[in-house]
Structure formats: C-alpha cells, structure tokens
C-alpha cells in the first residue's frame, strides 16, 4: 500500500471549535485493525495545527513520514509543558501507555504512521486543559465501524 499517494484511503477529518484555545485540524485513516488489539493508523496534520490534547492508553509506536511533528509533553497535574520535541521525517518513537501530550504539525504539516496495541479496549483519551477526560477512542468501536464498512 502506498501511504503517500493513495486515493483509496478513507480520511476522517477533525477540526476544533471555539471551545478550544488552539487550532485543531488533522485527519486520520484506518489502515488495519486486527482482533488481537493491534491498530495501524495514518494521521496527517495541517500546517501548525494540533490534534486534541490527549493521553495514550495503548502501547504506541509512531514514525514520521513527512514534515515535522512537534510533541509537547505535559505534566498532567500542573498542565505545564515539560518539554517539546520536534520529530522529523524518519523519526521513530515508542511509548508505553500514560503519556500526556499535545501534537501539532510543523510549518508544512505532518504525515505520521501510528501502530497501537489496545489494552483493556482503550486506545487514547482526549483531555480538556485541566486533564478531564472529554472523549475516548475504543478498540471495539473502531473494529465495529470497520466491519460495518464505515
């Protein structure tokens, strides 16, 4: 499968509204999901835009394919940024569950391959600025949508 030029990929776009104080504009495409809890996703960010503030609840690996991915690690207790890492094309990372962070595309956006392994059905939790859970990505819901053809 060509991840760079593939008109058959189905993209789901996410944009923020006035309730967020940072620009949200990114898309996700489900590449693969297996009964053993593994999920492969391709994400792309618009230039200088974020995805939702979140915590991974699954074991996660990622590889930047194009552009830059700016990752801000956040202290969940204080909300302060602990560090910022700029990942460039070719950069690979592996994280255990629990990592709280913000991600945004660089000046030209970003294209990133994510490989997750669900633990207890959960993949990630979207968070408000104060750390309150405002949404959750669940393995069984994604699997059901895939089987239904959505």
Model-derived regions, located:
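A short hydrophobic beta-strand segment most commonly corresponding to one strand
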Residues: 94, 107-125
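Short glycine/proline-enriched turns and hinge-like loops at secondary-structure junctions
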Residues: 55-57, 105-108
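Conserved short histidine dyad/triad with adjacent acidic residue
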Residues: 39-56, 77, 87, 96-98
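Short acidic-glycine-tyrosine-enriched beta hairpin
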Residues: 35, 75-106
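Glycine- and acidic-residue-biased ligand/ion/polar-headgroup-sensing regions
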Residues: 56-78
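Short, charged/polar surface micro-motifs in flexible loops or helix N-caps
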Residues: 36-38, 47-49, 68-70, 99, ...
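A short, N-terminal "cap"/entry segment at the start of jelly-roll beta-barrel domains
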Residues: 1-37, 81-85, 127-150
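Conserved hydrophobic/aromatic beta-strand scaffold that supports enzyme active sites
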Residues: 28-30, 40-44, 61, 84, ...
């Amino acid at each position: 499968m060509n991840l760079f030029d593939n008109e058959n990929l189905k993209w789901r776009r996410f944009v923020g509204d006035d309730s967020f104080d940072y620009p949200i504009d990114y898309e996700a495409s489900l590449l693969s999901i297996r009964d053993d809890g593994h999920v492969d996703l391709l994400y792309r960010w618009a230039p200088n835009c974020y995805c939702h503030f979140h915590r991974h609840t699954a074991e996660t690996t990622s590889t930047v394919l194009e552009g830059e991915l700016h990752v801000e690690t956040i202290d969940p207790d204080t909300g302060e940024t602990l560090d910022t890492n700029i990942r460039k094309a070719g950069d690979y990372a592996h994280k255990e569950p629990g990592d709280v962070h913000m991600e945004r595309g660089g000046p030209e956006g970003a294209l990133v391959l994510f490989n997750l392994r669900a633990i207890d059905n959960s993949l990630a939790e979207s968070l408000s600025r104060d750390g309150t859970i405002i949404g959750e990505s669940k393995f069984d819901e994604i699997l059901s949508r895939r089987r239904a053809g959505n």
